[in-house]
Design a protein with these regions (language model features):
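Conserved, single-site charged/polar hotspot
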Residues: 2-10, 18-344
Length: 344
């Protein structure tokens, strides 16, 4: 995974809530980066799809365009604009498969139930999907290419733990589909490694002091993971011990970047400072938190190792542990010391 990670808060779910978490659905806001005032919903052959606004549902047999019209939603080809939320599902069983797209921008397949509601200048799309579908989708999107199965299983446990413990990160839905929460793409097919990793670890989560841990992870740590305190982040219950990552220490992912004087003045050794610069200058401006610096020709040159915040699971290091025979449990124990893996 080469994408920089945003802060993932280390929230915790009380142990008493574990028994209530079975068969949960996850509400994920999708395609929000585009802030679009129109969304096209297309059926998939063999998958029933119907929509409703509170009255009788109508079948969707061809692409349906929903457009924002003032504070209402107009469906292309209809006479009236609708108040409130449009709900789309299979009818009888609820979840179904469909494609949601932003015209001229992106089209993505989903499995679940779709909600579309009007906001001030855009339409808000939320997919309500089964927990394990969401886990498999994130594993497919977040994991490095060709990661071994045990590394994917470790990722699945971390992903599921985050979904259970960090619910409610957004006002209108629980999670977004970007690295602010967890990156999500189309659900993988049943023959894929990501699907099998989620299935093999179904229901397993990380526990610390009888609470589910919202597990943080990043692409590569540079040889040693960070604590929350080192990056100016508050302690929410799990201390995130700094651990050595042998693979990244031997073969660190190196980078060099150059900052203008005015930008360098805003750089501090914290995750929030790095992210603020990344939003301004682009995600490759300061790829990670482990770096040295020196002045050169009126600029500040950063020479660093590691990509992402470097807290918790190192995906690059975990993949190497798996290639050398470590199980997903051993990988998780290495990067999240003093935790347990249990069925939720």
């Amino acid at each position: 995974m080469m994408r920089p990670q945003w802060i993932i808060a280390a929230l915790l779910l009380p142990g008493a809530a574990l028994a209530q978490a079975q068969d949960k659905e996850v509400r994920i806001g999708v395609l929000g980066l585009f802030h679009s005032n129109q969304i096209v919903v297309s059926p998939i052959a063999g998958q029933p799809l119907q929509c409703r606004t509170g009255g009788e549902p109508w079948p969707v047999v061809e692409p349906m365009r929903a457009e924002l019209e003032g504070t209402k939603i107009r469906i292309t080809g209809t006479e009236n604009a609708f108040d409130g939320t449009i709900f789309c599902d299979s009818g009888a069983s609820g979840a179904t498969e469909f494609v949601a797209s932003i015209p001229g921008k992106i089209a993505r397949r989903y499995s679940g139930k779709l909600e579309i509601r009007p906001d001030l200048r855009e339409l808000i799309a939320v997919v309500v999907m089964p927990m394990e579908t969401a886990v498999a989708s994130v594993v497919a999107a977040e994991s490095p290419p060709h990661a071994p199965m045990e590394a994917l299983k470790a990722q699945a446990v971390a992903t599921r733990s985050f979904f259970l413990a960090a619910k409610g990160r957004h006002h209108d839905f629980d999670f977004c589909d970007t690295t602010h929460c967890q990156f999500l793409r189309a659900p993988p097919g049943p023959a894929t490694a990501a699907f099998n990793a989620a299935a093999a670890t179904r229901g397993l989560v990380l526990i610390y002091k009888d609470q589910v841990l919202a597990a943080m992870y990043s692409a590569s740590c540079g040889g040693r993971t960070h604590t929350l305190a080192e990056l100016g982040l508050p302690d929410h219950g799990y201390p995130y011990f700094a651990v050595t990552c042998n693979y990244c220490r031997r073969r660190p992912e190196k980078w060099v970047t150059q900052l203008k004087t005015e930008d360098a003045a805003a750089l501090a050794p914290t995750e929030s400072s790095r992210l603020n610069l990344a939003r301004k200058l682009g995600w490759k401006s300061v790829p990670g938190n482990s770096y040295s610096s020196h002045a050169e020709n009126g600029s500040l040159v950063l020479e660093g190792v590691g990509v992402g915040h470097g807290i918790g699971l190192c995906q690059r290091g975990g993949a190497d542990m798996a290639r050398h025979g470590s199980s997903f449990l051993e990988i998780l124990q290495h990067y999240y010391p003093n935790t347990e893996v249990k069925q939720y």
